[in-house]
Regions:
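N-terminal beta1-alpha1 ligand-phosphate binding loop
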Residues: 2-35
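Glycine-rich phosphate/pyrophosphate-binding loop and the adjoining helix
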Residues: 2-6, 21, 147-196
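Cofactor-binding loop segments of dinucleotide-utilizing enzymes, especially the Rossmann-like FAD-
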Residues: 12, 43, 123-124
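A generic structural motif
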Residues: 33-39, 146
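N-terminal beta-loop-helix "entrance" segment that forms/cooperates
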Residues: 43-60, 161-165
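Helix-loop-strand module that forms the ligand-binding subsite of alpha/beta enzymes
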Residues: 60-144
């Protein structure tokens, strides 16, 4: 019998009160309902310098990058709420992805991304809901070998979208976001059953 899918959930924002932190919690709830074990983290707890090849050559991976990489390797799935900054992903998210991608010792290239399944959501006060950032995030993860499910949700008008308990006021949007979490869990389970 296969184990429950393990999914790592986080937002590409370190801002307190981030709409994307609220949104990824909803997606994580959907993954739990779909049978997954979900670990929620905050990138604020993993401060890292900007990726620098000279720094890596001289000092290796920063300690927080190593910790984050271990978490990636311990989970089969990712749920990411990716804010859009100037039409692309946030610097903190790109930096985390870059550090985690780095090889240590004799490990395989991109070991932390091997056989990963990911689901993407975004929240923004603007009309597009962070959609352009999702395109960029999907492209980067796909280039790293991650299977990003086709369903995604870009939440516009995020400033007024959440109730006092952190749920979405719009039940259709809530269902879409929880559905993405559940679909990541189901996809991992199906791949496990197929022997991948």
């Amino acid at each position: 019998m296969s184990q429950s899918p393990k999914i790592l959930a986080f937002a590409g924002s370190t801002r307190q009160g981030s709409f994307n932190k609220k949104l990824v919690k909803i997606a994580a709830g959907g993954a739990r309902d779909g049978g997954a074990e979900v670990t929620e983290i905050d990138l604020r707890d993993f401060p890292m310098p900007l990726y620098d090849g000279d720094l890596e050559a001289n000092e290796g991976l920063p300690e927080h990058a190593k910790r984050l990489k271990v978490l990636f390797k311990q989970h089969q799935g990712l749920l990411i709420s990716a804010p859009e900054y100037n039409g692309g992903m946030s610097a903190v998210l790109k930096n985390a992805i870059d550090w985690v991608s780095r090889r240590e010792g004799d490990e395989a290239a991109l070991a932390a991304y091997k056989d990963k399944v990911a689901g993407l959501v975004a929240a923004s006060p603007g009309r597009l809901g962070g959609l352009r950032g999702l395109v960029h995030t999907r492209q980067i993860l796909t280039n790293l070998g991650v299977l990003v499910i086709p369903q995604q949700h870009a939440l516009s008008g995020a400033g007024d979208a959440f109730d006092d308990d952190g749920a979405l006021k719009d039940s259709t949007a809530e269902a879409a976001v929880t559905g993405i979490g559940a679909r990541v869990a189901r996809t991992i389970a199906a791949l496990q059953a197929a022997g991948r």
